[in-house]
């Protein structure tokens, strides 16, 4: 009887080890992060000043646009939105509030621009 148990345990472990990568692969492929949209704001003319993040926050917040973060980056400002559906409205608001800036909406995975103004 001891011999039977010894043979069953390794086969159960082998089966578990064979199925584990498949389970991990399936769980990773089924998880998909929602698309994140960010607005990339750059000055219309090189060297022109951009407003600070608080000004941008005020303009978007007063219109009900939810913001994840506002980050300065290489003479530009990156605004990450909480809701991708609000990107069009946010782009329009910022294009009006910042007439001397270019506002580009991009997906976070680095694909081509969604809209530009």
UniProtKB/Swiss-Prot annotation:
Membrane-spanning segments: 12-29
The UniProt record lists the keyword rRNA-binding: no
UniProt membrane topology term: Single-pass membrane protein
Cytoplasmic face residues: 1-11
Periplasmic domain ranges by topology: 30-117
Location(s) in or outside the cell: Cell inner membrane
GO cellular component term of the entry, any: plasma membrane
Similarity comment text for this entry: Belongs to the MzrA family.
Name of the protein this chain belongs to: Modulator protein MzrA
Protein's organism: Dickeya dadantii (strain 3937) (Erwinia chrysanthemi (strain 3937))
Gene: mzrA
């Amino acid at each position: 009887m001891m011999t039977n148990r010894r043979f069953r345990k390794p086969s159960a472990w082998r089966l578990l080890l064979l199925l584990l990568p498949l389970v991990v692969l399936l769980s990773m492929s089924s998880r998909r992060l929602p698309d994140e949209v960010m607005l990339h704001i750059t000055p219309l003319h090189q060297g022109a000043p951009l407003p600070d993040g608080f000004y941008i926050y005020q303009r978007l917040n007063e219109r009900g646009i939810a913001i994840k973060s506002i980050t300065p980056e290489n003479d530009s400002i990156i605004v990450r939105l909480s809701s991708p559906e609000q990107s069009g409205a946010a782009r329009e608001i910022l294009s009006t509030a910042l007439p001397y800036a270019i506002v580009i909406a991009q997906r976070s995975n680095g694909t081509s621009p969604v809209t530009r103004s």
